């Protein structure tokens, strides 16, 4: 059985009847499996860098996919060329991958909307913040959650026709022959492109410097402009810190659940890094301090736990 981090799916490497090395995946949720199967086939047919599916069981609970090896981008974070290739490839998955996409198959929701944002914020509150025993005002916290939800859902009146990967981070990027391949995109949905950039560049254990983040954002936007010539870069950049805030809170919720409740060491080890990320985000963005003063105060209190 292959190593997993936060997933309950079972992955094994096998040799199929054609003598190929394949990855067999046994899922726990049919709808989630169905989403991955659809997305993998859709992206592969478009020539996007995802594993090819070879076989799917009748009940869609098990499938085999192309074996991309054992090399993940997380183990090569000092290789700028690979990082840039991954960011540029992401833009293609987000834009080209959304063409003729059936959003109804997405799991658990078809789009990045107010309800799914509140799920993430409550994940932070209940699975992380309450577990720290820090005293806080729920009304004040919820007021700022409302502000963040409004900022993320009213920046554009129409939800963009782009694919939001949801868990785009370096552990979910395989490297083969010097090229990135994407896995674990079954949580994807229709949504804004900034979320995945935030997810990747502010991954806690990646610990990218601000300068490197800016370089990679520039490379990503350079690629995105070729796919979306009408892109407003100032508006895109202005919204990014709010997506970073949401993603960081969501990740802390996940680390709290997987670490505090499931006692998984990797997630416990990541909590101090994520807290430093949260605090650094506020320190680098005076506008965030102004718009979310209570969350900023909480970030200062949480830093004392590190």
Question: Can you describe what each PLM-predicted range is?
Answer:
Residues 122-131, 194-230, 242-262, 274-281:
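Active-site activation/catalytic loop segments of kinase-like enzymes and analogous catalytic loops
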Residues 36, 79, 83-86, 117, ...:
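Hydrophobic packing residues in well-ordered alpha-helices of helical domains and bundles
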Residues 253-306:
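ATP/Mg2+ or Mg2+-diphosphate-binding catalytic cores
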Residues 230-238:
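Histidine/acidic-rich helix-loop-helix segments that form or flank divalent-metal centers
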Residues 79, 137-141, 238, 263-267, ...:
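Residue-level recognition of alpha-helical structural elements
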Residues 82, 116, 160, 165, ...:
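Secondary-structure capping and boundary motifs in well-ordered enzyme cores
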Residues 10-15, 149-197, 207-208:
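Active-site acidic catalytic loop and adjacent metal/ATP-binding pocket
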Residues 3, 12-119, 123, 130, ...:
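ATP-binding pocket architecture of kinase catalytic cores
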């Amino acid at each position: 059985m292959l190593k997993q981090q936060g997933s309950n799916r079972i992955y094994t490497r096998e040799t199929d009847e054609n003598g190929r090395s394949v990855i067999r995946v046994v899922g726990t949720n049919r709808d989630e499996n169905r989403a991955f199967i659809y997305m993998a086939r859709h992206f592969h047919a478009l020539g996007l860098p995802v594993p090819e599916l070879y076989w799917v069981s009748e009940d869609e609970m098990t499938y085999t996919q192309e074996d991309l090896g054992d090399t993940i981008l997380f183990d090569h974070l000092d290789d700028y060329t690979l990082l840039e290739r991954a960011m540029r490839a992401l833009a293609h998955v987000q834009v080209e991958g959304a063409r003729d996409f059936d959003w109804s198959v997405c799991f658990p929701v078809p789009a990045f909307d107010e309800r799914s944002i509140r799920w993430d914020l409550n994940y932070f509150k209940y699975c992380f913040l309450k577990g720290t025993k820090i005293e806080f005002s729920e009304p004040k916290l919820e007021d700022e959650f409302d502000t963040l939800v409004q900022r993320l859902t009213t920046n554009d009146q129409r939800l963009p026709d782009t694919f939001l990967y949801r868990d785009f981070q370096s552990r979910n990027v395989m490297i083969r022959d010097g090229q990135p391949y994407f896995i674990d995109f079954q949580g994807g949905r229709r949504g804004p492109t900034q979320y995945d950039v935030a997810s990747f560049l502010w991954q806690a254990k990646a610990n990218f410097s601000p300068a490197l983040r800016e370089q990679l954002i520039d490379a990503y936007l350079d690629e995105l402009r070729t796919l979306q010539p009408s892109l407003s870069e100032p508006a895109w950049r202005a919204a990014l810190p709010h997506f970073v805030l949401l993603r960081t809170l969501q990740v802390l919720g996940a680390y709290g659940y997987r670490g505090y409740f499931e006692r998984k060491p990797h997630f416990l080890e990541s909590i101090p890094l994520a807290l430093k990320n949260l605090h650094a985000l506020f320190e680098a963005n005076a506008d965030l301090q102004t718009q979310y003063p209570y969350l900023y105060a909480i970030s200062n209190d949480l830093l004392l736990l590190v």
